[in-house]
């Protein structure tokens, strides 16, 4: 094939140009993201039961829905929360690769079976089914410079005019409002109701009748009488629009003609739909929209669309209102991609300089350089064909591929120059002869490197999704690299190169003259050293055994992890006050947190967005969350200004607040996989022991974890503590004896204390809700319940104290379930110096000491880490086996591949040493670096073994003579290609700033592995080849 293109160079150029054009078109169309879709697809079901406590919600809503979610394809696990705000969220997580649209449809179908079994109030509120990630893509905050504008005003405008618009954008999975839109609030006065012998039930019934929209028909509607000349719609009763109209609602007309109206027994106002949340941006009243990404959507495209839409809406905002982005994960995505692209160009420049150093011929250097854009652009075309995106992982693959793809072209050019010098042939003939010598080695190298990376593509879970990005990118680049080396590079050599003399390098002066002289002396010294080594192979095999033993020790001692942490420019702070703490107390702590960040960390913090009443641990008055946005990376130089350093200082200072727990934490490397770094542990009641037993087990586990501060830190329940609850018990026999309806009792309790949604009203053209509830002063104390009255069958007003008793109990404001069983989520982090894998192992060990019937499981990113840890050994083993089989097929020998494979531990030991010295961990990126090193180590060995084998078979050389000739001939291309690769990944290894954690994790390991593989392999490969050939003749 090479000879065909040597004779037809324009044909080769045409193919290369077509490939580059396809790649250029692909780049314009490929989406850009930080990561591909790595997190397993998830579908969430949300419902609301106004006024219900957590236990009631769990028993009447959560379990009913869960029990119908059976038989759904590819369901991995299911978790749910039920809280005392009456809300329930059930999240179903599916195996990677599941079509999220199909999953959503299946969940909706199952939900249809459960819906008729749910309370009427829940059905009336509506049940939503969304496919979205569990964490926020961004938070859009809205503040006003107008001092008269309240949070309710801002919230209502955002809810009415912005929220739905953003929800409809492509890529948006869910939009959560931090605030509430307006609602008509009827605040009942219990004393006045009793005075007029009215009940909340009377109020609700009259509102349903009088605040109603009637379809009244038409005058002259069809069928009409012959000759009818009039047709008009009839508008009869319509819904009310303002508090004045509601105040005039007639509750009762007395026999004397007097009228009791709603305003006589209640306060009517346009208030908030709920008062659960207080939002602030840098201490100013605000509203916020927490935007979650739809499953499979592109983060950058979605964020760009959101900002464009808000910019479009900005001119229509009320005077003084503006939008800010106090929490945005996308700048990190953009900058990290930019950093990798910059690294890509730096790698190309360094590789060019290495090639010019060794080749010292601009024409010769230009040939491998031309191969770089051809192969890289071609790889983009293949990524587009596979439906991939331009993301951190594919770009890492490109950076690794640069060193690999120029290798093939360098081998071709270097060998053509050598043949021209030694055989004094013109370029065309030299190229033909050269290609006949190295074509087998090129194919062998391609097979080996492909064999290393292809098994990665077949692994499951989120880890498999990461591996596939590298696998497809690198294998595509390798395949194209070999094709270019067999098609374009020979054609370029035959047309661009000029004949060179045998004294080509010796005639150079200056730096190149010194370099060539030094290198030639080194080659002679190296060849003599190899000759001596081959005379005492036993000693070196012993040294090799010690190296392998050291490799095993290093591997066992290397801490494990899933992905490295990153400074993403944002982080979160969770606030948890003691059970029963009020919203007012929580706000004071949030104000302290805001003051700390804006004053003590003003050099690093851009803004703080706080939400009172909301937390990832649940919605309650004693919970809060702060979204902290840091200043741009270029303004935060130095480790002391990194997100990790800011979080560490905040933990120390905010930990001194006595009124509650304040826990700052970093975002996970892949936001889709959770909300916090560290581990995510589910403690499960497997035997139906009950909430109290599960709580005791949780506290026991937390106590045991606290005894290991050297390994575990910030171990905490991701939930709300049990709190005092006021239990009201109705004596049904007494109630019936008094002629009181049980349904009236229930409706009165629900309305007065929890609030009842009645129906809707029209506010400025938008439908909003109408709520009835007792005014605040009538529901503050236990004795206020006794002031509630219901009317008996004979018209007498009966106080609740006549048929109820009450007492205090403890209960949870938030109940959790995992896979249909009661559970409690526990989060924590590995202590500095401890790997996440070791921390997880310790948690499992502690959990095994809990009482019988208490089980555990991992969820979120920890589930994926456990899965990846189990896959890693199999991945390395399969890669070893496949490489060996490919080499056996290439050499038609079972023994020669052994001499190649024996060199692999020499590269692995370098990866492990580098990782140990620079505090890297055994994570997914480490495994990619390890596999890359396996392939590259084998590549160097192939260059020597292939030549030695040919010299023995074609020229009849002895095994030692052939080996010495091979190492002498191949040392230059081995060092050149290895140095090119090492310098190609150097920018990754020394990177800092956005995305540097991942870049370092890849670069440091590969660089260390390549250094050791090169320095050790050039001495050990000859030993392995000679020993194997002697042991296995032929």
Swiss-Prot record:
Q: Which residues lie on this side of the membrane: Periplasmic?
A: 29-339, 386-391, 461-473, 557-871, 918-923, 993-1005
Induction or repression: Induced by LeuO, part of the acrEF operon.
Gene Ontology MF term list: efflux transmembrane transporter activity; xenobiotic transmembrane transporter activity
Q: State the family named in the UniProt similarity comment for this chain.
A: Belongs to the resistance-nodulation-cell division (RND) (TC 2.A.6) family.
SUPFAM superfamilies with a match to the protein in the record? Multidrug efflux transporter AcrB pore domain, PN1, PN2, PC1 and PC2 subdomains, Multidrug efflux transporter AcrB TolC docking domain, DN and DC subdomains, Multidrug efflux transporter AcrB transmembrane domain
Q: Which GO terms describe its biological process?
A: xenobiotic detoxification by transmembrane export across the cell outer membrane
* Assembly information from the UniProt record: Part of the tripartite efflux system AcrEF-TolC, which is composed of an inner membrane transporter, AcrF, a periplasmic membrane fusion protein, AcrE, and an outer membrane component, TolC. The complex forms a large protein conduit and can translocate molecules across both the inner and outer membranes.
Q: Which GO terms describe its cellular component?
A: efflux pump complex; periplasmic side of plasma membrane; plasma membrane
Supply the alphabetized keyword list: Cell inner membrane, Cell membrane, Membrane, Transmembrane, Transmembrane helix, Transport
Report the locations given in the UniProt record: Cell inner membrane
Species of provenance: Escherichia coli (strain K12)
Segments spanning the bilayer are 10-28, 340-359, 366-385, 392-413, 442-460, 474-496, 538-556, 872-891, 898-917, 924-945, 974-992, 1006-1028
Name of this protein: Multidrug export protein AcrF
Asked if Iron is a keyword of the record, the answer is: no
């Amino acid at each position: 094939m090479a000879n065909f293109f040597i004779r037809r160079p324009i044909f080769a150029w045409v193919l290369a140009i077509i490939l580059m054009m396809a790649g250029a078109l692909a780049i314009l169309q490929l989406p850009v993201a930080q990561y591909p879709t790595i997190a397993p697809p998830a579908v969430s079901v949300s419902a609301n039961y106004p006024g219900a406590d957590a236990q009631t919600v769990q028993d009447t809503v959560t379990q009913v829905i869960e029990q119908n979610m059976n038989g759904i394809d590819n369901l991995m696990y299911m978790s749910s929360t039920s809280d005392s705000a009456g809300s329930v969220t059930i999240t179903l997580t599916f195996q990677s690769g599941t079509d999220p649209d199909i999953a959503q449809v299946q969940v909706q179908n199952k939900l249809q079976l459960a819906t008729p079994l749910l309370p009427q109030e829940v059905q009336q509120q509506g049940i939503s089914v969304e496919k979205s990630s569990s964490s926020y893509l961004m938070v859009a905050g809205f503040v006003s410079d107008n001092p008269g504008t309240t949070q309710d005003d801002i919230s209502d405008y955002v809810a009415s005019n912005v929220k739905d618009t953003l929800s409809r954008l492509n890529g948006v999975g869910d939009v959560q409002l931090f605030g509430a839109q307006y609602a008509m609030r009827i605040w009942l006065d219990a004393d006045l109701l009793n005075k007029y012998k009215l009940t909340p039930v009377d109020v609700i019934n009259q509102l349903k009748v009088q605040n109603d929209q009637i379809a009244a028909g038409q005058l002259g509607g069809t069928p009409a009488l012959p000759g009818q000349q009039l047709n008009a719609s009839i508008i009869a009763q319509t819904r009310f629009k303002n508090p004045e109209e509601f105040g005039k609602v007639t509750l009762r007309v007395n026999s004397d003609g007097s009228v009791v109206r709603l305003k006589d027994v209640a306060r009517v106002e346009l208030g908030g739909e709920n008062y659960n949340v207080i939002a602030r941006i840098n201490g100013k009243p605000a509203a916020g929209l927490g935007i979650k990404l739809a499953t499979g959507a592109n983060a950058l495209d979605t964020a760009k669309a959101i900002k464009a839409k808000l910019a479009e809406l900005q001119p229509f905002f009320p005077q003084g209102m503006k939008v800010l982005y106090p929490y945005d994960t996308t700048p990190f995505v953009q900058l990290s991609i930019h950093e990798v692209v910059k690294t890509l160009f730096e790698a190309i420049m360094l590789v060019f300089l290495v090639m010019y150093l060794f080749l010292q011929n601009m024409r010769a250097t230009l040939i491998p350089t031309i191969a770089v854009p051809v192969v890289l652009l071609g790889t983009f075309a293949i990524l587009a064909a596979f439906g991939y995106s331009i993301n951190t992982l594919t770009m890492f693959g490109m950076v690794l591929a640069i060193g690999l793809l120029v290798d093939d072209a360098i081998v071709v050019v270097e060998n053509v120059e050598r043949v021209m010098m030694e055989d004094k042939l013109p370029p065309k003939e030299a190229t033909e002869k050269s290609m006949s010598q190295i074509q087998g080695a090129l194919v062998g190298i391609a097979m080996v490197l492909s064999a290393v990376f292809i098994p990665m593509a077949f692994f499951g879970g989120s880890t498999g999704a990461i591996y596939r990005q590298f696998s497809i990118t690198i294998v595509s680049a390798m395949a194209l690299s070999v094709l270019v080396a067999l098609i374009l590079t020979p054609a370029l050599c035959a047309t661009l190169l000029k004949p060179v003399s045998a004294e080509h390098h010796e005639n150079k002066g200056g730096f190149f003259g010194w370099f060539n002289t030094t290198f030639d002396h080194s080659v002679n010294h190296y060849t003599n050293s190899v000759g001596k080594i081959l005379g005492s192979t036993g000693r070196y095999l012993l040294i090799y055994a010690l190296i392998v033993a050291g490799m095993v020790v290093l591997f066992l001692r290397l801490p494990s992890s899933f992905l490295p942490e990153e400074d993403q420019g944002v982080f979160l702070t969770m606030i948890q006050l003691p059970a029963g703490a009020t919203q007012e107390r929580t706000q004071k702590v949030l104000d302290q947190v805001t003051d700390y960040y804006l004053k003590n960390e003003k050099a690093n913090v851009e803004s703080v967005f706080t939400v009172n009443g909301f937390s990832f641990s649940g919605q309650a008055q004693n919970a809060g969350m702060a979204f902290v946005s840091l200043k741009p990376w270029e303004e935060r130089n130095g480790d002391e200004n990194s997100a990790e350093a800011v979080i560490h200082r905040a933990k120390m200072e905010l930990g001194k607040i006595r009124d509650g727990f304040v826990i700052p934490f970093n975002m996970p490397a892949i936001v889709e996989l959770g909300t916090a770094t560290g581990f995510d542990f589910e403690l499960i009641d497997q035997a139906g022991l009950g909430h109290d037993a599960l709580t005791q087990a949780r506290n026991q586990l937390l106590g045991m974890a606290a005894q290991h501060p050297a390994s575990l830190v910030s171990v905490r329940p991701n939930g709300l503590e049990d709190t005092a609850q006021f239990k009201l018990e109705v004596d049904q026999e007494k109630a019936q004896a008094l002629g009181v309806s049980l349904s009236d009792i229930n409706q009165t309790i629900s309305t007065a204390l929890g609030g009842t949604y009645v129906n809707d009203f029209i506010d400025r053209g938008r439908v909003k809700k109408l709520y009835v509830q007792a005014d605040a002063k009538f529901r503050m104390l236990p004795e206020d319940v006794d002031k509630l009255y219901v009317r008996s069958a004979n018209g007498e007003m009966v106080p609740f104290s006549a048929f109820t008793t009450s007492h205090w109990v403890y209960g949870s404001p938030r109940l959790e379930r995992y896979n249909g069983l009661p559970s409690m989520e526990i989060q924590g982090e590995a202590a500095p110096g401890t790997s996440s894998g070791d921390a997880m192992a310790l948690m499992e060990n502690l959990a095994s000491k809990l009482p019988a019937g208490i089980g555990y499981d991992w969820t979120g990113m920890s589930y994926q880490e456990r899965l990846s840890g189990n896959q890693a050994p199999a991945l390395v083993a399969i890669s070893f086996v496949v490489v060996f089989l490919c080499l056996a097929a290439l050499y038609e020998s079972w023994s020669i591949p052994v001499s190649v494979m024996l060199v692999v531990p020499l590269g692995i030991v370098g990866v492990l040493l580098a990782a140990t010295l620079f505090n890297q961990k055994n994570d997914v990126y480490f495994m990619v670096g390890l596999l890359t090193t396996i392939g590259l180590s084998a590549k160097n060995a192939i260059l020597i073994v292939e030549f030695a084998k040919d010299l023995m078979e074609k020229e009849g050389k002895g095994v030692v003579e052939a080996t010495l000739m091979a190492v002498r001939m191949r040392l230059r291309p081995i060092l050149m290609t290895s140095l090119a690769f090492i310098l190609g990944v150097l920018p990754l290894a020394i990177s800092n700033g956005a995305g540097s954690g991942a870049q370092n994790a890849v670069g440091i390991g590969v660089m260390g592995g390549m250094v050791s593989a090169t320095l050790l392999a050039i001495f050990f490969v000859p030993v392995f080849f000679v020993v194997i050939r002697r042991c296995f003749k032929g």
